[in-house]
Structure formats: structure tokens, C-alpha cells
Swiss-Prot record:
Residue positions binding Zn(2+): H116, H120, H126
Domain of life the protein comes from: Bacteria
Species classification: Bacteria, Bacillati, Actinomycetota, Actinomycetes, Micrococcales
Designated name of the protein: Endoribonuclease YbeY
UniProt cross-references to NCBIfam families, sorted A to Z: rRNA maturation RNase YbeY
PROSITE patterns xref list: UPF0054
Name of the gene encoding the protein in the UniProt record: ybeY
Source organism of the structure: Pseudarthrobacter chlorophenolicus (strain ATCC 700700 / DSM 12829 / CIP 107037 / JCM 12360 / KCTC 9906 / NCIMB 13794 / A6) (Arthrobacter chlorophenolicus)
GO MF, one annotated term: metalloendopeptidase activity
Necessary cofactors: Zn(2+)
Signal sequence annotation: none
EC number from the UniProt entry: 3.1.-.-
ATP-binding found in the keyword field: no
Amino acid sequence: MSIEVNNESGVEVDEAGLVALSRYIFEQLYIHPQAELSILLVDEPAMEKLHIELMDEPGATDVLSVPMDDLTPGTPDRPTPQGMLGDIAICPQVAQVQAKNAGHALQDEMLLLTTHGILHLLGYDHAEPEEKEEMFGLQRELLTGFTGKEAPAETTQ
């Protein structure tokens, strides 16, 4: 699997941890081993620009997902086909504020946002209460399994 992290944010982030988490999620959700994912870490002005371009909403946000191929979680007998999962843009500056407000470390927030972004790439959403329950439940399960501790509270905007 190809997972690339490009840090243009100016904030020091444990990029290896984000890659390890992504690999864990790919394995848990039976994503094809040749699937590709790009994680871009950007500063607030760059995130605001992306937020306007992609969502037509002003202001920086925490995470944006841009799916490429229409991939969904697989099963043990039928993994996801090979393809480009997509791109995730994360703003560590916004994540720092959210982590502080939630009372957990920046790395915990970065792991939360990475998981959240990957789930969006796989078609999960949280617009409706049932969708939110399913997505956030899976998000907590994946984070707890990866870190071995209780997942941080959801802080996504």
C-alpha cells in the first residue's frame, strides 16, 4: 500500500504514526494492499483556501477528504479492489486548538482526524444521526484498537 504524508503546515507532526494508523485501518477494513492514500498537512490559510474550493465554506477547518476511486470497506473474502482511495488534508493548527479544548494531546487529535478522513474516503458520513452513530462508533473502535487506549472524544467541526 502506498501512503504518503506531505507536511506543509510548519507544525511538527508524528508522520510515521499517521502512516502506521492508516495501515492499521486498511488492514482492519480489508482495503486492498495496493490502495493509495495521500495525507497533506497544511497551514490555516491553505486549509481555508481548500475549504472554500471544495465545500464553498469560509474559514479553515480541521480535515477535508477528497475521494478518488469509489472504494468501500471490504470483507475477509472480498477485499476492496486496488485503487486510489484519495486525499486527506489536515490542518494541525486547527487540530492543536481542538486538542487543547478537548483536553488531549495533539497527536491524539491528529490520529482522530486521520481516521475521520479515511472513513469519509470510504463513503462514511455523519449528516444523519444514524450515519453519525455508525461512523463515530467505527472511528472509536479503530482508534482504540490502534492505540490500545480509549479513543479521544470527537472534536471534528
